[in-house]
Curated annotation (Swiss-Prot):
Name this polypeptide is given: DNA-directed RNA polymerase subunit omega
HAMAP family from the UniProt entry: RNApol_bact_RpoZ
Lineage: Bacteria, Pseudomonadati, Thermodesulfobacteriota, Desulfovibrionia, Desulfovibrionales
Keyword hit for Nucleotidyltransferase: yes
GO BP terms in the entry: DNA-templated transcription
Gene name for this UniProt entry: rpoZ
Alphabetized Pfam families for the sequence: RNA_pol_Rpb6 (PF01192)
A GO CC term assigned to this protein in UniProt: DNA-directed RNA polymerase complex
């Protein structure tokens, strides 16, 4: 089983406070009905970190919400 660490995510997002904010916002999106972008049987927070480490989610310019690959395809 692969372990996810904050260091794995910081390769994509260098600001750890922004990283935490992104993970929280992504968990809120799951609870609103968004689907996970990676296969994971873990808790929501771990799934969010896996998505960030995989580059599947990115912060928007104002960090109000997290953009997913699906958001980019819709544009």
């Amino acid at each position: 089983m692969a372990r996810i660490t904050v260091e794995d995510c910081q390769e994509r997002v260098d600001n750890r406070f922004l990283l935490v904010q992104m993970a929280i916002k992504r968990v809120h999106q799951y609870r609103e009905g968004y689907e996970a972008l990676v296969d994971s049987r873990n808790k929501e927070v771990v799934t969010a970190l896996r998505e960030i480490a995989a580059g599947k989610v990115l912060p928007d310019e104002e960090a109000r919400y997290v953009e997913t690959e699906e958001d980019f395809r819709a544009e």
